[in-house]
Amino acid sequence: MNAERLMMVLREPHTSEKATVMADKFKQFTFKVLKNATKTEIKLAVEHIFNVKVKSVSVVNVKGKSKRFKQTSGKRSDWKKAFVSLHADQDIDFTVTE
């Protein structure tokens, strides 16, 4: 797997109330990822970027919501969400910048 592809797989961390609780209690972090990314690619990308050991990866395809503006109806984009579980002694700190 080339490093350029691994850097593109993770788009951004997904922050919500549920994601924050999961990170604090269970060491499970949530990311928005490319729609065509596989579990193996996500695992390798997290291990490569954050220097941690990944325990497991679960993915969910999120359907975009239908939205209306006056008479025009539209749809937000579909996206993929990845739940990454780390080993007990590992942690990711998003506040540190390099």
UniProtKB/Swiss-Prot annotation:
Electron transport found in the keyword field: no
InterPro entries found in the cross-reference section: Nucleotide-bd_a/b_plait_sf, Ribosomal_uL23-like, Ribosomal_uL23/eL15/eS24_sf
GO-annotated molecular function: rRNA binding; structural constituent of ribosome
GO-annotated biological processes: translation
Disulfide bonds, paired cysteine numbers: none
Keyword RNA-binding annotated: yes
Pfam families registered for this protein in UniProt: Ribosomal_L23
Cellular component GO terms, alphabetical: ribonucleoprotein complex; ribosome
SUPFAM superfamilies for this protein: Ribosomal proteins S24e, L23 and L15e (SSF54189)
Swiss-Prot/TrEMBL keywords: Ribonucleoprotein, Ribosomal protein, RNA-binding, rRNA-binding
Family: Belongs to the universal ribosomal protein uL23 family.
Subunit and interaction comment: Part of the 50S ribosomal subunit. Contacts protein L29, and trigger factor when it is bound to the ribosome.
Function of the molecule: One of the early assembly proteins it binds 23S rRNA. One of the proteins that surrounds the polypeptide exit tunnel on the outside of the ribosome. Forms the main docking site for trigger factor binding to the ribosome.
Name the UniProt record assigns to this protein: Large ribosomal subunit protein uL23
